[in-house]
């Protein structure tokens, strides 16, 4: 069983907790988001005692999974719509509109996912535990 050490940083008077990986827990929590599911899984398996790091690792895996499923669903919908609506010249205009809307939805999902990813890394580094609606519920079940 790994022991956690509490050190007081004299400059900021903040207690730092070292995780089982040898990193401060806030650094380990932030790094668990770095490569999504992969780093989330690594930190989730390494950290057995530190609930802060385990939650961020689990939420990283869940968030990555939810975003991945959303991309796959959007790709399937786009492929089906393109196949159906571009099959004849009478639906070409509607197909073009639907294609543009799906492209905008994909762009919003990509930029939104990136913004949430950066937000989660920053907040974990600050020692906070933001809860993303679907991902946090899944993370709680994994804990």
Show the residue positions of the predicted features:
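Membrane-interface extramembranous regions at the lipid-water interface
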Residues: 2-63, 122-143
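Hydrophobic alpha-helical transmembrane segments in multi-pass membrane proteins
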Residues: 29-46, 60-120
């Amino acid at each position: 069983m790994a022991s956690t050490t509490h050190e007081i940083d004299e400059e900021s008077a903040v207690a730092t907790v070292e995780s089982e990986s040898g990193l401060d827990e806030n650094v380990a929590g932030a790094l668990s988001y770095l490569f999504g599911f992969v780093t989330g899984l690594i930190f989730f398996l390494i950290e057995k005692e530190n609930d802060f790091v385990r939650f961020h690792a689990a939420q990283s895996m869940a968030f990555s999974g939810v975003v991945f499923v959303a991309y796959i669903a959007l790709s399937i919908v786009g492929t089906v719509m393109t196949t159906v609506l571009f099959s004849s010249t009478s639906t070409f205009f509607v197909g073009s509109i639907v294609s543009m809307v799906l492209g905008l939805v994909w762009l919003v999902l990509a930029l939104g996912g990136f913004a949430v990813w950066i937000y989660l890394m920053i907040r974990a580094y600050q020692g906070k535990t933001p809860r993303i609606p679907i991902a946090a519920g899944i993370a709680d079940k994994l804990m």
